[in-house]
């Protein structure tokens, strides 16, 4: 993290969510597949899943006393017919701002 120093590594933290596909979304996605274009229903579902998994990971990091998470990675997997897991993980750390190397001429 630019301008910060990691002072303590706490632990690996993660968050996940499992979502199932919606029959209506599948039908519309099938039509889009034929004519081409973005599958917006799935894009929205994936964005919701990312947000939920991230919030769960952040909550775990905060419970450890972390003020940052580094090395964040996302992974997806199919776990059952029509259901997928989105998994996010990273390392919970404590960071502190670096001391400026030169005096700031704008803040005497």
Swiss-Prot record:
Transmembrane segments: none annotated. It holds the Pfam family YbjQ_1. InterPro entries: UPF0145_dom_sf, UPF0145_YbjQ-like. It comes from Acinetobacter baylyi (strain ATCC 33305 / BD413 / ADP1). Belongs to the UPF0145 family. This is UPF0145 protein ACIAD2946. PANTHER family: UPF0145 PROTEIN SCO3412, UPF0145 PROTEIN YBJQ. It comes from the Bacteria.
